[in-house]
């Protein structure tokens, strides 16, 4: 992993391929991290300058005392600049879709495209704040050994996966050792007070780069 400091926090990222090729950066979902997409890097490295990253408060990146949607945007653009990515295509999955859309609202003139994966842009009247009903986060759960924590790892929402080896790999890289045991890599307080905003449809209509939407064929979150 490489790291770049953004507003006092070290942000983790990984990159593959020739920086002279089209740049693509992939943004993960809630409580995820760069390793969710690491296995794709080698597949795309011959044609693209491919980058994955972990938002602050997740993966190998530092935690912060408070987070806003602009916090994550700054994380992304800090990585883009540090990796020397020119006119990148940004691919955002779920929560990463929200972050990528807000990133595009500020930087679409410097982007080659935006791909939103399993993310819906709602009209203002249909907007729902994801974290409005969230109770303040409790301290991270600590367990004695890594294996017990990995056994608790689940996909959300629950679903079958034909590539269990990928789930096992992700679970293994979703833990961190503390002074008293093992815990997940994400900051439980990352979403306390986080406002995603009701301006997504307005942002979408004003973007200056091509936009694509992708939904998993077997997703349980969305209907065709």
Positions of the model-derived regions?
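The conserved beta1-alpha1 loop
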Residues: 25-29, 215
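Gly/Ala-rich beta-loop-alpha elbow adjacent to hydrolase catalytic centers
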Residues: 92, 96, 100
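Alpha/beta-hydrolase active-site loop signature
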Residues: 31, 55-59, 121
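Active-site glycine-rich loops that stabilize anionic/oxyanionic intermediates
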Residues: 20, 29-32, 94
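Active-site loop/oxyanion-hole signature of alpha/beta-hydrolase fold enzymes
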Residues: 4-14, 39, 51-91
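Serine-hydrolase catalytic-loop signature spanning alpha/beta hydrolases and amidase-signature enzymes
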Residues: 29-39, 50
């Amino acid at each position: 992993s490489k790291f770049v400091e953004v507003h006092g926090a070290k942000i983790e990222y990984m990159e593959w391929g020739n920086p002279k090729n089209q740049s693509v950066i992939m943004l993960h979902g809630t409580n995820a991290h760069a390793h969710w997409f690491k296995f794709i890097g080698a597949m795309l490295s011959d044609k693209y300058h491919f980058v994955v990253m972990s938002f602050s408060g997740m993966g190998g990146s530092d935690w912060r005392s408070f987070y806003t949607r602009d916090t994550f945007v700054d994380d992304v653009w800090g990585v883009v600049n540090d990796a020397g990515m020119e006119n990148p295509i940004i691919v955002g999955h779920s929560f990463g879709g929200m972050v990528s859309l807000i990133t595009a609202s500020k930087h679409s003139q410097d982007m080659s495209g935006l791909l939103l994966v399993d993310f819906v842009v709602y009209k203002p009247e249909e907007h729902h704040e994801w974290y409005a009903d969230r109770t303040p986060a409790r301290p991270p759960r600590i367990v004695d050994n890594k294996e017990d924590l990995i056994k608790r790892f689940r996909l959300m929402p629950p679903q079958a996966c034909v590539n269990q080896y990928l789930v096992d790999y992700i679970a293994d890289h979703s833990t961190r050792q503390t002074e008293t045991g093992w815990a997940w890599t994400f900051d439980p307080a990352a979403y306390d007070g986080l406002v995603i905003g009701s301006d997504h449809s307005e942002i979408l209509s004003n973007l200056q780069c091509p936009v694509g939407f992708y939904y998993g064929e077997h997703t349980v979150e969305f209907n065709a």
